[in-house]
Amino acid sequence: MKQRKLKTKWMLITTTITFLTIFLFSIIIIFFLSNSLRHNEVDEAERSSEDIVKLFESKQIEHVTPLDLNASLGNFQKVMLFNEDGHKLMETSNDNSITFSPNIVPTNVNRIAVKSDHKKDYLIITDHIESPKFNGYSVIVHSLEDYKALVNSLYFIALIFGVIATFITAIISYFFSSQITKPLILMSNKMQQIRRDGFQEKVELSTNYEETDNLIVTFNEMMLQLEESFNQQRQFVEDASHELRTPLQIIQGHLNLINRWGKKDAAILEESLDISLEEMTRITKLVEELLLLTKDNNNSRDGEIENVEINQEIASRIKSLSQLHSDYTFEFDAFPKPLNIKIDRYQFEQMLIIFIDNAMKYDQINKYIQIQTKLRNKQISIEITDHGVGIPKEDIEFIFDRFYRVDKSRSRKLGGNGLGLSIAKKIIELNNGTIHVDSEVDKYTTFKITF
């Protein structure tokens, strides 16, 4: 089905609405106007009939002349005089075109009636005359042809006016619809250009229409988000490929080493297998974290949400880590009252381990980790501080990006792949939390998580 242009549709709608409005308005006006004119015709005929009755009440019939009767008649009228038996006594008219002469039946007289003769309409007013001087009937024949011609002229004028108004409306609608759709057409052309040339093109238009200007702003913002998302996705693929390439090359190198000398040399075989298994573990962890990030990007909260008392969870994690890393000092300053948040317990533990593990990696000299919980303004905060190498201020805004590492060589030696903080931030955001970083190079780094 062929789609119509918005400009054509707008013009058709406005023209149709205008035509229907004028049509209905004209019908209503003509209806009331024709009724008013008809009442005027009836009033005029009744006045003439009343004058005729008064004339015969004041004069003997023998003294009434046609001139007297004509003086009582209005325009386009004829009068006929009947006795009580229905016999016509006289008639006169001021309009020779009125040839219609109705008869009356004394036993069945309608005072006001409309009759037709040769496709002409007449208003008939019949009055009974009772006076000492004459008894009978006066009949006024009032032509309605002038009234009909006037009403027909009104219909014709309304039709001409409607056609002219509709035509003018169509022209105006075409002009305005062209003005309204012009920015949309320009936007469409610009979008096609963007599709051909890429995200670097932006729609730069000012239409003086709030709606279309807002649409352009929204479109440009959407394009910026798409460009950013596309660049992040491309960078993500490049970084993931790089991270996977290194351990795979190491594994391939050691497999070649085993194939060449390891079959006969047990030491080379064992060393190569250990290194290959270590790299396989790194790959497995990397893939698991990538899958977790992908799931989190879909705003997934598949875990069981429960009330978690964070002081107990942190104390439990610190106890386990202290036994595993006895050379580290963990200082926990817990809020004196229980602090409960609604979160998936596994996600909370994972987030906590990521931050503590990150603090331990970058504090290899002092090996002193501080953890503090607070409650302020109904907000629960967790602060994790290490006293290691710190983060340069220019790098702080990027540390939550995937695969981003402040010191790539150091991070790889420590077993990092740049995904941990991204995962932790996703967990925090999924649970309506925020994260703030404060750091000074070679002094400290503090991660503050707020729920």
Curated annotation (Swiss-Prot):
One of its GO terms (molecular function) is ATP binding. It catalyses: ATP + protein L-histidine = ADP + protein N-phospho-L-histidine. It is found in: Cell membrane. Gene3D superfamilies: 1.10.287.130, 6.10.340.10, Histidine kinase-like ATPase, C-terminal domain. Its EC number is 2.7.13.3. The modification Phosphohistidine is found at H242. Residues 239-451 form the Histidine kinase domain. One of its GO terms (cellular component) is plasma membrane. Keywords: ATP-binding, Cell membrane, Kinase, Membrane, Nucleotide-binding, Phosphoprotein, Transferase, Transmembrane, Transmembrane helix, Two-component regulatory system. Residues 178-231 form the HAMP domain. PANTHER family: SENSOR HISTIDINE KINASE ARSS, SENSOR HISTIDINE KINASE CPXA. This is Signal transduction histidine-protein kinase ArlS. It comes from Staphylococcus saprophyticus subsp. saprophyticus (strain ATCC 15305 / DSM 20229 / NCIMB 8711 / NCTC 7292 / S-41). The gene is arlS.
